[in-house]
Amino acid sequence: MSKATCIMVQGTMSGAGKSLLCAALCRIFAQDGWRVAPFKSQNMALNSFVTRDGLEMGRAQVVQAQAAGVEPDVRMNPILLKPSSDIGSQVIVNGEVRGQMPAAEYFRRKKQLIPDILAAYNSLAEDFDIIVIEGAGSPAEINLKSEDIVNMGLAKLVDAPVLLVGDIDRGGVFAQLFGTVELLEPDERARIKGLIINKFRGDVGILRPGLAMLEEKTHLPVFGVVPYLKADIEDEDSLSDRLQVKNAVKPLDAAIVRLPHISNFTDFMPLEQHPLLGVRYVQTTRELGTPDCVILPGTKNTVDDLLWLRQCGLEAAISKLAQRGTPVLGVCGGYQMLGQTLADPEGAESGRPQTLRGLGLLPTQTTFAAEKRRTQSQATVTAAPFAGAHLTGYEIHTGRTTVQGAPFCTLADGTPEGSVQGQVFGTYLHGLFDSGELTEQFAAYLCRRKGIDPAAAAPISMQEYRTQQLDLLADGVRHNLDLAAVYAAMGLAQPAERGNDQ
């Protein structure tokens, strides 16, 4: 079997649009008939996913795999860093936790992971035709280049041609692109085959003099000017923008607590798409107000975030709302917080042995341990008023929770999962709203409580919605990128049947 060819997308900065451009290329190449896989050697993210094999990887490569029409595979993201504090991260290699590591220590040791990176990449390259590689941040971070394993360092290891993308929406795109190229070594510059300007609004004709000058100064062609596309696809940067939403503009008000170490808040994207649900993220009691429901999301540090919740007054405010009958939902770390006690006898979660009281809204006790549970799950909700809703999700957590009372749902093997007491619900299952059934019943339940006709609460299938948005993204990129030049950079001919509509 011949080895795959590849193309790498690097950016002038974080947020330039690398992840979504890679997703678009995965979609385009798959539409053109190629077997495509994404790859990012090292990803730093709070939002992760569990594969069918029970291994953990970054969600950006999950989205890119979905764009390519293939199942997410941990080989697509061999190193995942999950920040657990301001100076340290949990290091996950090939889907398994290697441990907590301060940033300085990881920087010194990360080149030791090159064999893992190459093994994952080479294995993928045996199974696919094209590998779409995503860089991280900027290749011109000259203080980090000596230990680089994700930008030009990786490009050299796998002999990848590079597309360099700059974000015009934030201004200074010509300086971004020119400055980045100038800071690279000659052999690194030689890897760049073309420049891309991303997130453009307006008449591209205004840019043409600047494009010509940029090409003259960098001796590199501009492969395209991609407009600011409205495709609603999760990536780390757009997700961060979602956390800024403070006001509900729909009939139902769902307040999600923005914990300091919030993670996997992709769980709530289906709620955001619902026509009646206004989702907002809150950090203070004033912002919390009197919503129609409160959601405590997952967190990378349950103990620290519980203490923060207590100190800022949100614990007391949420407890008062619950006493008045306001529905409260906790997911993963949020579920743990809702219980009676959280014990950390080995310091696995907090770094020192301790036991904390929870919010006391659910009859549960959680004990933390070093071993992490990672699994995909199917379940049927048993908790009224959502009984009968089927959902597919996944678990990523270190705590083990014992429940006195009714479960939230029953797993496919008959195991009870989660907890419910009155209008307070808790579950470990991430992705619980993706299938649409629980979203529908959740919205209808809130509608009935507020006297709104639930007929408008139509089910939302995230799979269908995501497919539509990926097609929208791919079409926008296909029409504005010189795909013939991209194919030529990979040493391939562009398939004639699709062509390029630029």
Describe the residue ranges of each PLM region.
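Gly/Ala-rich beta-loop-alpha elbow adjacent to hydrolase catalytic centers
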Residues: 330, 334
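Conserved P-loop NTPase catalytic core
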Residues: 348-375
